[in-house]
Amino acid sequence: MHIAVIGSGYVGLVTGACFAEFGVDVTCVDVDDQKIERLLNGVMPIYEPGLEHLVAKNTQAGRLRFTTDVRQAVEQALVIFLAVGTPPLPDGSPDLSYVDSAAASVAQYMNGYKVVVTKSTVPIGTGERIRSLINERKKTRANFGVVSNPEFLREGAAINDFMRPDRVVIGSRDEEAIAIMKDLYRPLYLIEAPFVITSLEAAELTKYAANAFLATKVSFINEIANLCDKIGCDVHDVARGIGMDKRIGSKFLHPGPGFGGSCFPKDTRALSSVARQFGNESLIVDAVIEVNRRQSSEMFAKIGKLVGPLEGKKIAVLGLAFKPETDDMREAPAIGIIQHLTESGATVTAYDPVAKDEAVKVLPDISYADDEYDAVAGADALVFVTEWNQFRALDMTRVRDLMKSPKVADLRNIYEPEDMREMGFEYVGVGR
């Protein structure tokens, strides 16, 4: 089977590389000729553990190709994945212009039966929108099926998530398209991955609902953490106490500076927008969004209480990406926190193991260190924002001795409060 993936960003590249690893013949297409040129030279446009190796392996094997030639890719493919961006508009709804453009390309070059699959996160009704657009613009009488096959990839663990998914959601009313999709995912039968076969609309809503629910857990535990700060108890004890309940589960009950990235902020706002379009209030989702917005200010207040007046102070920030094992700076909590610090007159020196190049684009006016110890030298305070594993193994005695003032705001609760205080640090965590 030959498939085409239109869009070679995070979702498209991981999807293409993983299907190629399954043995499928894959062509990844992108209108960005510089991105395609870099991919042809083995240079990844994103950081994702294991992806560079997977791309190189399957490119060398001849199963994975990159091109800007949409026509050739569409004409050769039986299944065409649309994995283009859906950035938010000012009202929170997704911009579908890239999806429309990709669907128009499929219509223009359709030369036989095709399965057109939305891999991008799209609002309810997009599948039918694509069907109508292709029907209006196709130049042949060829039939086609439309499928919603949302991705549930975690940045930093995307390859494992694709290869060993919790479930595969396939939404369509076309039985032939469903059969082809099942065949495409046949390698997953060996690990008995469950399949959810449903309507286009239910599949589209499933993606939004899943991310909104996970975001709800994050905002909930952050509210509990803020309450723990006032009460004087440890949020981790509370999280363990509720997380052991099988109805709740322990995942996503980790307090911190709030959620960021390409999914949770965008998808919660999009779900709220969709609800309004259908005349429905989304009270819980709206509250989740507000709690997350407020959390950045809560973290800044925590730093201010620790440090005092920030004018002229040097603050070291460790961790910039929205989570470990990625260079993704989209809506990263570090952005708002650092902007608060600099607006208050502090100077910021930051370090992140992989996100510097992306961080410079959104935070061009701060200093960037070569390593953790370079960042903390002469600092009036250290702020942990992203919980990279290497930050858990720092020589904290050396860190203390390098700092001007041994004050730590640990926004990811990487270290134990008592241990830090015994070492001579003035330490604050989140909900501890």
Model feature map: region roles:
Residues 1-432:
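Structural/interface elements that position substrates and couple domains in central-metabolism enzymes
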